[in-house]
Amino acid sequence: MQNLLCLTSDNSAAGYLKAHHSRSTSQPQIVSLPLRLIRTPLASEAAKLDEACVLSRLDAADRAEIYVDPDPNSQLLMALLLTRAYAARLDGGKIHLRHGPLRWAHVDAGTPPDSVALPVEADGAHLAAATAIWSAYAAPSPEAWLSLSPEDLAHFPAMHQAWDALLDDLPRADTGLGACEHLVLESIVARPRRVGDIARVFAQSPSPLIALPQTVALLSSLASGAAPLIEGLNGRLGEDDFADDVDALDAFRDSQLALTALGRSVLAGETDMVKVRGINRWWGGTELKGHTCWRWDNRSRMLIPPARPEM
């Protein structure tokens, strides 16, 4: 009997596999790895891979399948897993990738995986490309990410879209907004929207960058400080405590959000968010902090380095 290991990027995808295999005579090992690799310090617990455990499971399995969602976080997780397997010199021939055209969590339990995506063997070229991709993302500046070769990206069907979406989440050249901040402001510019509406906008994005806990923390950040961009938020919750208090969560979720005058000015390109509010977040291995930082000019497709402090 073949020892099959299935790795997923979230618990919902693992739920699909468990439901699908519930009546099988041979049960695979199904392991969920819900790491947060976007806008999170890569050294933090939220982004930490239990490397020894995962590599041990991969080594012991006769066959391993990685169920890859098309969103950027799942693409990065795949790159990280293959990078670690490559560094550990595991047999890449036993690792197979299933690139879902949609999130695996949305697949009906009665639908076999082969009907959604056939497995692709992670050969040496895949492992080397994944290593280049992860190394570029974890670098202390986004320059290596921009310089990734089209050949490396092409080994994975959704990686080019993830590459582009992540560049767009760097602070923009004119407004200082990343893609996530821009999506929030753009969603409520016409009329007030509830927090639940904003969460759905993120979930339905063609290339969602962050999940619900991080969306909650982002809204709290945009509503806080001496120069808030949004108003109307009831309470402030972080990404790791948003489910601790049901009453607080209900009040937070039902908040009617609107743009402040500053928020409208930033969205219109009249004011630079980073210059006014500063910034304190991570983009891969790049720390974005203070009132000057790396930026992305989508029109010219160029990175703009932080301004050097005046002598």
Please name every model-derived segment.
Residues 229-310:
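Accessory beta->alpha helical hairpin/"wing" motif in late/C-terminal subdomains of nucleic-acid enzymes
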Residues 38-65, 86-88, 93:
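A broadly used, surface-exposed interaction patch
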Residues 29-37, 87-118:
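Conserved beta-strand -> loop -> alpha-helix junction used to position metal-binding or nucleic-acid-contacting
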Residues 7, 61-73:
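Acidic beta-strand-to-loop metal/phosphate-binding motif
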Residues 113-193:
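A conserved mid-domain beta-alpha-beta active-site/ligand-binding segment of alpha/beta enzyme cores
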Residues 203-236, 240-241:
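Charge-enriched amphipathic alpha-helical scaffolds
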Residues 191-203:
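Short acidic, hydrophobic short linear motifs in intrinsically disordered regions
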Residues 1-47:
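A structured, charge-rich N-terminal accessory region that forms the first stable segment of a protein
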